């Protein structure tokens, strides 16, 4: 895959990611970086980033990482996702996500995403499995 193809696939984010404010920073086959500003719209009643927003950030970066590693004609969807919440991320902070492969196989890919706060401390660690599929209408 050429650099142009990789960037086109990686930076062509779905509408849900744009709605969240997902910002892709860089995309390489073995590391994808992204960020998300924590706004009141993404918070829970305690004034910190909602767990669902953290999981959505991780799911989107994991999907992006898989998409740039797929053979031509294939697509992906999440098969399994597990999140360990470690620390809160407060409104006004930025959640930074780093996604790296644990396994890149023919039928599944497993990714680990570490989400950190602005102070660099880990807020969540997510492990997800993506299945490689042929898309059918």
Task: Describe these PLM feature segments.
Residues 1-137:
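Terminal targeting signals and extreme-terminal segments of soluble enzymes
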């Amino acid at each position: 895959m050429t650099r142009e193809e990789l960037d086109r696939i990686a930076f062509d984010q779905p509408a849900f990611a744009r709605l969240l404010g997902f910002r892709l920073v860089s995309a390489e086959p073995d590391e994808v970086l992204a960020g998300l500003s924590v706004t009141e719209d993404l918070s829970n009643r305690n004034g910190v980033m909602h767990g669902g927003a953290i999981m959505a950030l991780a799911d989107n970066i994991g999907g992006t990482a898989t998409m740039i590693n797929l053979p031509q004609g294939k697509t992906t969807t999440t098969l399994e996702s597990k999140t360990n919440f470690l620390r809160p991320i407060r409104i006004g902070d930025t959640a930074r996500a780093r996604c790296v492969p644990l396994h890149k196989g023919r039928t599944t890919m497993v990714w680990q995403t570490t989400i950190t706060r602005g102070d660099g401390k880990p807020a969540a660690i997510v492990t997800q499995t993506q299945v490689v599929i042929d898309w059918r209408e």
